[in-house]
Every structure is written in structure tokens, then in C-alpha cells.
Swiss-Prot record:
Transport keyword on record: no
Misc. comment: Present with 538 molecules/cell in log phase SD medium.
Biased composition range(s): Polar residues: 76-95, 115-142, 688-699, 710-735, 774-810, 827-845
PTM annotation (Phosphoserine): residues: 137, 280, 504, 507, 556, 980, 1022
Residues in cross-link Glycyl lysine isopeptide (Lys-Gly) (interchain with G-Cter in ubiquitin): 526, 743
Gene: SEG2
Region feature Disordered, mapped onto this chain: 76-142, 171-225, 404-429, 510-938, 961-993
Name of the protein described by the UniProt record: Eisosome protein SEG2
Length: 1132
């Protein structure tokens, strides 16, 4: 017995495989299907005893059977089994074997991984047809031996193994047994027909689907044991073991609907309900409705199966509808919930945004309120400061210094530290005023204005008595320290400012007395007038500074009150000045005297200029020293004043500092010159400032133009100066500005030159003007014009030389060895005429002069292959070898140049052959006699050429046709009749400029014993041809070659490159070629070329001398090319 696979075993293995978990190690018992037979526990104890006694033996025997691979060993080792030769077995032994088989199957499945149903698989209809029982020989006990299958785990699942068992005779009646045998394989058990029908239908469908797969897999040698189990075996098992289940509980099998769902969703496993009720998987009412009572006995199994399937389909459809409805409801609920959540999120976001916006609005409102309050405070402070500034300015101008006499020389007064921080104009004026004050004080009651710095005073009057004591009288209307500290830009207190002013004045009076000069008594009146002028100028200057700042503040505030405040400030200009006569100017008439004050300012400025010139002339050395020490004093003063900042400094000093920075231009001269020039410039700038302010109060542009010496012209028109001052200023300004002007004038000039030199056409550049010559452009233009004219005009001497060089390649000079070559051909080819006299009319029409394509011709050694001519084109091909073809009246020619040179330069006559002059007519009979030109005496109208041309052509055609019919072609002739390895170019009528000539340097072979040497004719284009090789080979007519070969005459080609026109040979239909460039390019095909006698000598018409020369050279000269042919073709 040989083990083989069975569909039942595969079905079981598939069931277990489906029940396996994902890891493949454990089996889900709920997923194992229930098979179609249900058993109850057996009550007989004898059968149970027999079953359990044989359990151990069956296990050991089955394992040994698997190990040895032979089923027959099982029967030999079992003592209860009879001989294999007997075919009769007892019923008891068969029953015991069946019990063992069931127990072995159960234990095997348990060992494999889980429980298995105890129901026996039914055989499908395909395998159940062969239901013949397997019986063996009867044993001594009368029992029969049968074989059953055991399922053993294998590499692909469970493997079925057939084991022989003893079958006991049935205990039931024969009628019952016959009824069961007559039934189908799908017959229902006796207990419950309905349930067994469903079980069988389901399991048969599974087994039948997998049976087809298993049958193709493993077939054994004996197909009889692997196809089916007998009906006898099935019925006996049903009868004997109907009540012996292997598993105590039953499992409900899957319905058809569940099976379809499993097919749709194979990964979803639905557990089966296991219960003790056998019919729990389906309601009996369904079966009662599906099967009518009257038809229960008459319906077949197939009909019942169909009805059940229809019912299951309906149920499945209903369940699908219900599930779809439920899914839709769930989806709607989920959507509603998601929408609700989104709405909540949106609401929360909106609420948060509203809160943020509210907070931002509140913050903005608070900031706006704070800003409004700040603006109000700033405006109020500005107003207060503006009023206080006016009062302080008016009070400062009313300060007087009392000096009783001039007898006591007092130290010269030097302006305080803060004055040096002011512009240089104020310092110079202050020094001059102090000199005047010290000299012009005659009376003790004389009150003079003390030029104390505006920023160092804080609304208090300083009075200097005769003892030089300083008293500080507080004013009731003066500002207090607390009021000043309220403003953001003002620091310090009133008392501090007063103390600072006092100490600064005292220190300056005691320390700086060197730079002042005391004038003589004679000049007292003059000094008094100047002092008055200076006082008024100083006051005007201070008033100007205060008025300027006030106007700027008023304009920035854009308040209507500013228009009312400016007139009140004009009262500051009216200062009470007390001279020695006691005359006092009224302070209240300021608005009425504005114009007078302006005129006084101009006059005072002129006087100041005169005075300054005198002082500078006298004290030049002292001023040099003072000017050199100005920077050191300024640094010290800055350090001292950084600690105290007066409110008036903020108002009045800052614009002056800006003015000083703008007008402070460095000088390139000696310090001594610089001191004098700076003083003049300072005077000039002050005058210009006063003039600009009087015209437009707050025009900063005009002010800057007047302050900057580079923006203003130093002419007398701008400043009202005296002639002396104009001359002195113009000289000093020119000396001071000239180096700068020279320096600045050089740099822009260099830039302009560089910039212009970047342009190619620039000729004004100082750098590139020498190199950029106009001759270059002219020579370039001449070159272009010459190139253009040369391309279109007639050829010059240079082009002639180029043409001569190109033509020399086309007409090379031949070696003298090849000039001596002779040609011998057969006697029958004495006279060869070219066919076709119909083209004679075309001779006189087209005349082409030589070397027409020499300019575009390729090199001499280039080669171009072509195919041999056909028989139809052979005549025209041979005619083209004799004479060049004439170009037809076609516009498609690409090789004719536009201009053909008619002569060659005489200087090149030694290197190149001289070309004949152009013919006046195409009917000339003779040409100039030249040794190196062929066909020199031939003409187009010679009688010998045209005589009997048609008759001879016809005769040659007849002879050639007869030879072709006779087939007399020697081996050597057809060898040379094939296309030669030498390249050629065929002549066609479409190629208008083709001229073929013999150029192959082949001579007679040296071995004269070979009588069958063949001529190889090659073609070459003349110098008119562009792109063909000079060495071109043409195939011959095979019949003509055979004629030439059978005559026994030797001949070969010639290869003299210098006298190509003298090399004309005919063989077969030998083509005659010429390189005479003077001939026209088209000749009639009927023109005979040469006459060859019986001895093989060539006689040319009108060229006997050349023939004699060729004959003399034939004996001596041999071509190297012929030697190469010997090597190629094996000639000896």
C-alpha cells in the first residue's frame, strides 16, 4: 500500500488552517466547523473496552507505519490480524480497527494543535461513484480486511494514509443494510434527517471545492486507493459507530450566509456557537416552512438544498439592509457630533478674539489719553519756557557795569568760558566790546552793557561797582529752580546757574587779560563810537538768536499765538544804553524803531570790520598765539560746562553751534594766515546771517548758503563792504580756496577723462587718445571694402595664384618613366568608333573652358566609388571617356563657378602647363601645337572623325551581340569584367560637367609569357571635376575582353600624369579618354579616337609624333601599379 493524499484529508487540514490564529501556533476552537454526523455516547461497555484496549497498539503501529513507509508491516506485526493471502475477515476485528482509526485521528489532531470533529467526511459525488467495497481474503476468524485512511500531519497539512482494518458483519437486519446501501452518499441518518441533510450539503461543498485541488497535487502509483471510499465502508461506519462521538459536545456549522461573508471578508473570523443542542444553528420552524409536510418524503436532497440556499440568500440580503441602515445612522450621528464640536471650537475662538480685541482697544484708549496728556504738558511747558525766555532776554540786555574812571588800568576783560563755545563771531565782538568799555568809561555814572553769556545768566542783574564787587539781585519775576526742573530738557536749579555764571565771569576776568589792548587817550571818542556800535551789534545778535529760536518753536507748534508773540520780542532789541552824556534810549519804543535798528546794525558791522582790521594789523602775533591756544581753552571749558546745562543754552547755543560746524572749513595755509582769514570770514558770515534773517526769518536754505563760504561768492554784491575790505577778503579767499579749487578741479577732470575713455569712440580722453588712432578705423573700413570687392569683382593676382595652385592638383606632372609606356592591344580592336552620332548637333552650342571647377575641387588623392555602367549606358559612358561632355542647358549644375579665369599667370608657367587662349569659334580645325597637350590638331569638324561613324558603330554592335550569344568568355576576361577594386565615377547625362579620362598608371606586365593579360580601364575626371578620385576603374564589356584575351597580344594601361591627353586606348568597347581641358565637354558618340594596327601599336589621328614617343617608351617603362595588380590577381 502506498500513501497518497485525499480530499478528505485536505478538507480537514483546511479547516484546521482556517482555525489557526495569526501567529500560526494556536487553534481557535470556535472557528473549527462541525461535520455532518452527530453521535451520542454508546452504552455498550464491551465496545468501549475493545476501543480502549486497542488504543495503544494503534498509536504505535501508525507511527511505525509512518516511519517505515510501508503499510504492510502493520499487518505483520499485529498478532490479531490473519494472513494477507486470505480475503475473509471477521466483523469483530473490523470494528476494532475502525475504533482505532477514530482514536488515532483524534489523537493526531490533538497532537497537531487542537480538537477535531468526530464526524466522518462524506465522499463527493465525483468520487463516490466508485463504491465498490474493498475486500480481502477471509481470515481464519471469518472477518474481512478493509483499508481506511488515517490523517497524519505532513509538511503541507494532514496526509491521508490507508490502513487495513477488520470489518465486522453488521448487526442490523439485511433490509436495513440494503436500504442504506441503496441510498445515496448524501443519505440522511436515521435520527434526524433534516439536520444531517444540511450538514452533508455544507461539508460536501467544501470537500468538493478542495478535492479538485488535491487530486492534481499528489497522485500515487496506485490510483485505485486514492479515488474514493466504498459505500460499504460508509454504511458500516454509520451502523457501527453512529453512537460513538470523539468529541462529547457538538458545534454548530456555519450557514451559507456566514460562508459568503467569510469569502467576502476572509480576515474576519466569526466564532461559532457551541452548544449541546444539535439543531441550535437553525430554527426548526424555518425548515418546516421550507419543506411542506406533504413533500417531505418526496423531495430530493438537491431540491432541499436549493430551497435552503434561497432562504439563506434572502436572510443575508435582509441582514445587509439592516446593517447598512445601522451604519448610516452611526455615520450621521458621528457627523452631527463632529459638527457640534467644530461649532463649539469656532465659538470659543470667536469669544477669545473678542476678548483680545477689547483688551487692545482699552490699551489703545489708555495710550491715547496718556499721549494727549503728555502733549498738553509739553505745550504748556513750551509756552512757559517761551515767555520766560523773552523775559530773560530782555533782562540780560538791561545789565549795566559801572566803572568810575579810566585812570586805573584794569585787567583786560576776556569773555567767559561759555562765550568760547559760541561761534567765533560772538567771541571777537565780545573782546572788542570789552576793550571799548575799559577805555570809554569816563563818568562813574556811565552804564555800559556787559556782554555776559546769555546761557550763564538766570534772570538776575549783575552790577559791578567800583570795587569790582558782584551783587546778585533776585528779580521777583525770575524763574525758580523748581519750575525749571519740571521741564524735561532743563537740568539744575536757578541758584546753581547763578553761581556758575558768577564764578565763570570772575575767573575769565582775572585770567584772560593778555589778548586785549588798551587804546590811547587820543582815540577815546573814536572808541566810544565803536563801542556803541558793538553794543548794538551784540544786542542785535543776541536778539537774533532768541528771536530765531522763538520763531522756530512757534512755527513747529502752529499756534495762532505765535503771531502775537513775535512783535513783543522785538522789544528786546531796544536795550537801554547809557553813555557818558547820560542819554538814555526808551525801551517802550521798540516796535517803532525796528527799521532804525536794522540800519544801525549794518553801520555797526561796517565799523566793526574796520576796527577788526586795525586790531589785527597791530596785534597779529598775539592773535596767532591766541588762535593756537583756542582749542585747548575750548576743551577745558567743555569739561567744566558739561556738569551744568542752562535752559538758555538749549535754546540759544545749539543753533549757533550748528552754524559754527557748517562754516568751519579747514584751511591749508600757515596758522598766521589762517588767523587773519578766519576773523574776516567770521565777520562776513555774521553780516550774511543778519541779512538773511532780515529777509526771511526761518529759511534754513538761505541761511546755510550764506553761512557756507563755498556756497556764497566772495563778491562785494553779496556783502555790503568797503572797497578795502572787498580787496582784502577777495585776496584772502582766493589764497585760501585756491588749493581746494585746484585739488577739486583736478579730480573731476580725471574722472571725466576716464569716463569718456570707456566709450570706444572717444577721442578726447587724455589717457587713450594717443592709442586710439583714426587710422585704425580707416584701415578696417578699407579691409572690409576690399574683401567685399574681391568677392564680387574679377580675380586678382592672388586669386589667380590660388587658382593656379588648385589647377595644378588636377593636372599633375607625370614622371618620365610613365611617359615611355606603350600600349598594345589585339588586332580586332584596330578601329573603335563610338556609337551615337545623334549628339553632333550639340557640339557647337556649349563651350566650357578649362579648370572651371578647380577652385572647389577636392585633393588629388581623394577617391569616390561608383557602380559599373549598364549595357544601355555603355556607349555614352565610353564616349565620355574620349571627350568631355558638354553641359546641357540646365540650371541644376552646382559645379560651374561664376567667374572662370581665361588665362594663367606667366610667372607660374614653369610649374603648370600653359592653358591655350580662348577660342573665338568652336569650328576651329587646329589649335596651337604644344607637346604637352593631347588632341592639339583635332577639331570638331574633321572629316576623318565623322567619316563612316554610323556604319562602324553598327558593325561593332552586331559583333558584340554575336559574341555575347556565343558565350566565348575566358576566365581572365570575366575576372576583369567584374567591378574592379579601383574606384570610378560613371558618366551620366545628368552630370553636366563630368569628363572621364584614363589615369591609372598601369603598364605592361613584365612576364611576357602570359599571353592573356587583360586591360583594366579606369576613368578619371578632368580638372573640371570636383569630387571624384583621379583613379577610377570601369568595367569592360566581357565579350570584348575575351576577344582581346584570346588573341595572345599583351597590352596594359599607361599612367603618365603629365601627358594625359596622349593616353588613349581601346579594349573591347574600349573607351578613349582625354584630359585636354580645351576640348568641349560634349562630343558625338560616333567619333573614333585611335587606330591600332595588327602589331598592337597605337596610331593617333593627327598626332603621329606622340605615337612614336609612346612606342619608344613601351619597351622600357613599366608601372608600379601593374606590379601591385600582379600581387593581387596572381599574375606571373
Amino acid at each position: 500500500m502506498i500513501q497518497e493524499s485525499s480530499p478528505d484529508a485536505l478538507a480537514a487540514a483546511a479547516a484546521i488552517g482556517n482555525a489557526l490564529s495569526y501567529n500560526g501556533r494556536t487553534v481557535d476552537k470556535s472557528k473549527i466547523p462541525q461535520y455532518n454526523q452527530s453521535f451520542t455516547s454508546r452504552t455498550t461497555s464491551i465496545a468501549g473496552i475493545n476501543r480502549y484496549t486497542m488504543l495503544s497498539n494503534s498509536r504505535t503501529n501508525s507511527r511505525m507505519l509512518l516511519m517505515n513507509g510501508n503499510v504492510r508491516q502493520y499487518s505483520k506485526r499485529t498478532s490479531s490480524l490473519p494472513n494477507q493471502g486470505h480475503k475473509n475477515t471477521s466483523n469483530n476485528s473490523a470494528g476494532r480497527r475502525q475504533h482505532r482509526a477514530h482514536e488515532d485521528a483524534e489523537t493526531t489532531f490533538r497532537e497537531f494543535g487542537g480538537k477535531q470533529s468526530s464526524k466522518v467526511l462524506n465522499i463527493s459525488s465525483s468520487t463516490g461513484q466508485n463504491s465498490k467495497s474493498r475486500t480481502t481474503s477471509l481470515g481464519n476468524s471469518g472477518s474481512t480486511i478493509r483499508t481506511i485512511k488515517k490523517y497524519i500531519p505532513g509538511p503541507r497539512g494532514l496526509m491521508a494514509v490507508e490502513v487495513p482494518v477488520e470489518v465486522e458483519p453488521p448487526r442490523y437486519s439485511l433490509s436495513n443494510r440494503s436500504n442504506q446501501r441503496g441510498g445515496r452518499a448524501y443519505s440522511l441518518p436515521t435520527r434526524n434527517n433534516k439536520t444531517s441533510l444540511m450538514h452533508r450539503n455544507k461539508t460536501t461543498k467544501k470537500a468538493g471545492s478542495q478535492e479538485k485541488k488535491s487530486e492534481s497535487g499528489g497522485k500515487s502509483k496506485n490510483d485505485y486507493h486514492g479515488k474514493v471510499l466504498s459505500k460499504m465502508h460508509t454504511t458500516s461506519l454509520k451502523q457501527r459507530h453512529n453512537n460513538v462521538p470523539l468529541i462529547p459536545t457538538t458545534m454548530n456549522e456555519e450557514t451559507e450566509q456566514e460562508l459568503q461573508e467569510d469569502l467576502h471578508d476572509p480576515l474576519e473570523f466569526k466564532p461559532m456557537i457551541i452548544s449541546d443542542d444539535e439543531n441550535s444553528f437553525i430554527e426548526p420552524s424555518v425548515l418546516d416552512r421550507s419543506i411542506p409536510k406533504k413533500d417531505k418524503s418526496g423531495l430530493s436532497g438537491r431540491e432541499k438544498k436549493e430551497e435552503i440556499e434561497t432562504l439563506l440568500k434572502e436572510v443575508h440580503s435582509l441582514e445587509e439592509k439592516i446593517s447598512n441602515i445601522e451604519i448610516a445612522k452611526l455615520n450621521e450621528e458621528e457627523r452631527e457630533q463632529s459638527l457640534i464640536l467644530e461649532l463649539r471650537k469656532v465659538k470659543l475662538d470667536e469669544e477669545r478674539r473678542m476678548e483680545l480685541l477689547k483688551r487692545e482697544l482699552n490699551i489703545v484708549k489708555e495710550n491715547a489719553d496718556l499721549e494727549a496728556q503728555e502733549l498738553k504738558l509739553i505745550e504748556s511747558k513750551r509756552k512757559q519756557h517761551f515767555h520766560k525766555g523773552q523775559e530773560v532776554a530782555s533782562e540780560v540786555k538791561s545789565i549795566t557795569i559801572r566803572q568810575p574812571t579810566l585812570s586805573e588800568p584794569k585787567p583786560a576783560y576776556v569773555p567767559p568760558e561759555d562765550v568760547e563755545k559760541e561761534p567765533s563771531t560772538l567771541s571777537n565782538q565780545t573782546q572788542n566790546i570789552e576793550n571799548a568799555e575799559n577805555i570809554d568809561s569816563v563818568d562813574a555814572e556811565g552804564n555800559l552793557v556787559d556782554p555776559i553769556l546769555l546761557g550763564s545768566l538766570n534772570n538776575s542783574n549783575f552790577h559791578m561797582n567800583s570795587d569790582n564787587e558782584v551783587r546778585c539781585i533776585a528779580d521777583s519775576n525770575s524763574l525758580t529752580g523748581s519750575e525749571l526742573s519740571d521741564y524735561n530738557y532743563i537740568e539744575g536749579s536757578a541758584t546753581d546757574l547763578r553761581a556758575t555764571a558768577k564764578t565763570s565771569v570772575e575767573s575769565e576776568i582775572g585770567g584772560n587779560q593778555v589778548g586785549l589792548k588798551i587804546p590811547q587817550d587820543d582815540d577815546s571818542e573814536k572808541q566810544e563810537e565803536r563801542t556803541k556800535g558793538k553794543k548794538s551789534g551784540l544786542v542785535d545778535t543776541n536778539c537774533f538768536l532768541v528771536q530765531k529760536e522763538d520763531q522756530e518753536e512757534a512755527l513747529s507748534d502752529n499756534e495762532p499765538e505765535s503771531s502775537e508773540k513775535f512783535p513783543s520780542t522785538s522789544g528786546i532789541e531796544n536795550v537801554k544804553l547809557e553813555d557818558e552824556t547820560g542819554s538814555v534810549m526808551d525801551k517802550n519804543n521798540g516796535p517803532n524803531n525796528d527799521k532804525d535798528d536794522d540800519d544801525d546794525k549794518d553801520n555797526d558791522n561796517d565799523d566793526d570790520d574796520d576796527k577788526d582790521d586795525d586790531v589785527n594789523d597791530d596785534d597779529k602775533d598775539e592773535n596767532v598765539d591766541d588762535d593756537e591756544n583756542v582749542d585747548d581753552d575750548d576743551d577745558d571749558d567743555d569739561d567744566d560746562d558739561d556738569e551744568y546745562h542752562d535752559s538758555y543754552d538749549v535754546i540759544m547755543r545749539d543753533p549757533v553751534q550748528i552754524e559754527q560746524d557748517i562754516s568751519d572749513v579747514p584751511s591749508l595755509k600757515h596758522p598766521s594766515e589762517y588767523s587773519t582769514e578766519t576773523e574776516d570770514n567770521k565777520k562776513k558770515e555774521q553780516n550774511s546771517e543778519n541779512a538773511e534773517v532780515s529777509q526771511s526769518g526761518t529759511n534754513m536754505a538761505k541761511y546755510l548758503r550764506g553761512a557756507n563760504p563755498y556756497l556764497t561768492n566772495t563778491s562785494s554784491d553779496t556783502f555790503s563792504l568797503d572797497s578795502e575790505n572787498v580787496n582784502s577778503k577777495s585776496s584772502t579767499d582766493t589764497t585760501r580756496v585756491a588749493p581746494d579749487l585746484l585739488k577739486s578741479s583736478l579730480q573731476p577732470q580725471l574722472r571725466s577723462d576716464l569716463k569718456q575713455s570707456a566709450v570706444p569712440s572717444s577721442t578726447s580722453s587724455s589717457i587713450y587718445s594717443i592709442e586710439t588712432s583714426p587710422n585704425i578705423d580707416s584701415s578696417t573700413g578699407k579691409t572690409a571694402s576690399n574683401t567685399k570687392t574681391n568677392s564680387h569683382g574679377p580675380p586678382t593676382s592672388i586669386s589667380k595664384q590660388k587658382y593656379d595652385q588648385s589647377s595644378s592638383h588636377q593636372i599633375p606632372v607625370m614622371s618620365p618613366k610613365r611617359l615611355d609606356d606603350k600600349r598594345k592591344i589585339t588586332n580586332r580592336s584596330c578601329l573603335r568608333t563610338l556609337r551615337g552620332s545623334s549628339n553632333e548637333a550639340t557640339l557647337s552650342h556649349n563651350i566650357v573652358y578649362p579648370a572651371s571647377d578647380s577652385s572647389s575641387s577636392p585633393p588629388y588623392h581623394s577617391k569616390k566609388p561608383s557602380n559599373p555602367p549598364s549595357s544601355g549606358n555603355l556607349a555614352s559612358h565610353e564616349a565620355s571617356k574620349c571627350f568631355p561632355k558638354a553641359p546641357q542647358a540646365s540650371t541644376t549644375s552646382r559645379r560651374l563657378p561664376d567667374h572662370v579665369p581665361l588665362y594663367i599667370d606667366k610667372n607660374n608657367s614653369a610649374l603648370y602647363p600653359k592653358e591655350p587662349p580662348a577660342r573665338k569659334s568652336s569650328f576651329e580645325k587646329e589649335r596651337p601645337a604644344k607637346d604637352n597637350l593631347g588632341f592639339r590638331s583635332m577639331s570638331l569638324r574633321e572629316p576623318l572623325i565623322t567619316k563612316n561613324a554610323t556604319a562602324t558603330a553598327a558593325e561593332n554592335l552586331d559583333v558584340e551581340e554575336k559574341k555575347e550569344k556565343g558565350g566565348h568568355v575566358s576566365r581572365k576576361s570575366w575576372t576583369f569584367g567584374l567591378p574592379s577594386p579601383l574606384k570610378r565615377r560613371t558618366s551620366h547625362s545628368t552630370h553636366t560637367t563630368n569628363e572621364t579620362e584614363i589615369v591609372n598608371p598601369m603598364t605592361n606586365f613584365k612576364n611576357k609569357t602570359n599571353e592573356n593579360d587583360m586591360p583594366i580601364l579606369a576613368n578619371k575626371k578632368s580638372c573640371n571635376n570636383d569630387d571624384s578620385s583621379p583613379y577610377t576603374a570601369s568595367s569592360m564589356n566581357t565579350n570584348d575582353v575575351s576577344e582581346a584575351g584570346t588573341e595572345g597580344h599583351r597590352f596594359s594601361l599607361f599612367g603618365n600624369k603629365s601627358q594625359l591627353s596622349n593616353r588613349n586606348i581601346s579594349g573591347g568597347t574600349a573607351t578613349l579618354e582625354s584630359s585636354n581641358p580645351d576640348l568641349p565637354t560634349a562630343l558625338p558618340l560616333s567619333v573614333p579616337v585611335t587606330i591600332i594596327d595588327k602589331n598592337g601599336e597605337i596610331h593617333k589621328l593627327h598626332n603621329d609624333d606622340a605615337a612614336i614617343k609612346d612606342k619608344s617608351h613601351d619597351r622600357h617603362g613599366h608601372s608600379k601599379f601593374g606590379r601591385k595588380l600582379k600581387k593581387i590577381f596572381g599574375r606571373k
